[in-house]
């Protein structure tokens, strides 16, 4: 039944579940389907979507920073206790940027991935899986079949050709802005990311040609 198979990354099924979808996509990106413990799926679903909308409806403001930090710590603790080779690190503030001396760039260069909070009309979560000299490879769980005009203006490519890894190719310049524009990380004090690794395949600095791009 293809137990060693990695599955395509998933899209959110509502306007609100980008957080749990991006986090579970990080796990799917790193691990084959047969290796993923059901407890991870259960707990990510249980502890996300904790924010209430303006009308008082549960989940309608998505997933909070507190919940994402809790889940990163829970995943790290669970993985140690269960001897599962996932490691997680939560970073925030000035530590979240792309480019030189970036924890995010370092993570993907070492074979990991990063769930990041950014802006796409509202605050949003997506998964960074790769980087080149001036582009970030991103899987945005919000489905688009083709680029909208604002993506074209920003130089962002939309692709469905790499379902296991990315569906957007985004210039570095988009991320480090402190504004609420498309894919900006926004003000430094509100930034956050979760770095994820499969410890069996995590590369060292000596193995990584593009270490700290």
Regions from the PLM with identified roles:
Residues 71-86, 116-131, 153-164:
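Hydrophobic transmembrane alpha-helix bundles
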Residues 89-143, 147:
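Active-site-adjacent substructure of cysteine-protease-like catalytic cores
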Residues 71-77, 100-104, 180-182:
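Intrinsically disordered, low-complexity boundary segments flanking structured domains
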Residues 15, 33-34, 57-66, 94-95, ...:
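Short, exposed beta-strand "edge-strand" segments with a Pro/Gly-rich flavor and a Y/T-containing core
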Residues 108-109, 131-213:
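Noncatalytic regulatory segments and standalone regulatory/sensor domains
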Residues 1-2, 112:
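N-terminal entry module detector
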Residues 2-93, 209:
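Cysteine-nucleophile protease catalytic domains, especially the papain-like/related folds used
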């Amino acid at each position: 039944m293809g137990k060693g198979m990695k599955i395509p990354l998933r899209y959110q099924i509502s306007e609100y579940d980008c957080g749990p979808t991006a986090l579970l996509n990080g796990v799917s990106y790193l691990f084959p389907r047969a290796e993923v413990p059901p407890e991870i799926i259960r707990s990510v679903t249980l502890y996300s979507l904790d924010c209430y909308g303006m009308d008082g409806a549960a989940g309608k403001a998505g997933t909070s920073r507190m919940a994402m930090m809790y889940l990163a710590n829970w995943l790290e603790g669970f993985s140690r206790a269960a001897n599962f080779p996932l490691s997680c690190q939560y970073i925030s503030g000035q530590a979240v940027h792309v480019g030189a001396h970036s924890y995010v760039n370092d993570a993907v260069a070492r074979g990991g991935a990063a769930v990041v909070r950014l802006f796409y009309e509202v605050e949003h979560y997506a998964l960074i899986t790769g980087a080149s000299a001036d582009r970030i490879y991103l899987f945005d769980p919000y489905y688009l079949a083709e680029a909208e005009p604002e993506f074209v203006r920003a130089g962002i490519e939309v692709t469905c050709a790499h379902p296991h890894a990315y569906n957007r190719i985004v210039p570095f310049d988009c991320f480090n802005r402190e504004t609420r524009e498309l894919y900006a990380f926004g003000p430094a004090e509100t930034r956050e990311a979760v770095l994820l690794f499969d410890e069996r395949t995590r590369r060292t600095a000596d193995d990584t040609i593009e270490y700290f791009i």
